């Protein structure tokens, strides 16, 4: 069981995550959002696994998450998601991220 994780809710933690994610060749990605209290769903959490660490990114902490853009659009990095439609839609809508080389376990 993987117990190596980092809560990303400060600029310092975001910098640590960015340094590791730049070197990753495979990312496991999931998002959590709240659509119960909001007319338009609100992204709350982004979880990214890059061996050997899981990054739990607080999307409500108002961090600069631009460091995610490069690995998400990289053709050389495999992004593994399950039922990726909403995850991709929210990340594109809220951050303008582009995605390439996606493996959706639901399809």
Regions found by a protein language model. Name each.
Residues 1-27, 31:
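N-terminal accessory regions of nucleic-acid-interacting proteins
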Residues 1-5, 49-57:
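Short, basic, glycine/proline-bearing loop/turn elements
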Residues 16, 66-76:
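Catalytic-core regions built around general acid/base machinery
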Residues 30, 46, 80, 104:
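A residue-level signal for conserved active-site and pocket-lining positions in enzyme catalytic cores
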Residues 33, 61, 107:
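Short, glycine/acidic-enriched loop or turn micro-motifs at the edges of active sites
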Residues 37-53:
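A short alpha/beta connector and helix-capping loop motif
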Residues 48-51, 86-107:
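Metal-dependent phosphoesterase core characteristic of DEDDh/y 3'-5' exonuclease domains
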Residues 54, 74-79:
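Short active-site oxyanion
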């Amino acid at each position: 069981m993987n117990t190596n994780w980092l809560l990303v809710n400060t600029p310092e933690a975001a910098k640590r995550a960015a340094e590791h994610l730049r070197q990753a060749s495979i990312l496991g990605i999931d998002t959590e959002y709240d659509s119960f209290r909001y007319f338009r769903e609100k992204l709350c959490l982004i979880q990214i696994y890059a061996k050997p660490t899981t990054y739990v990114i607080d999307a409500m902490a108002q961090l600069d998450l631009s460091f995610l853009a490069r690995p998400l659009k990289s053709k050389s990095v495999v992004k593994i998601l399950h039922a990726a439609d909403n995850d991709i839609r929210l990340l594109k809508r809220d951050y303008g991220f582009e995605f390439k080389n996606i493996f959706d376990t639901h399809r």
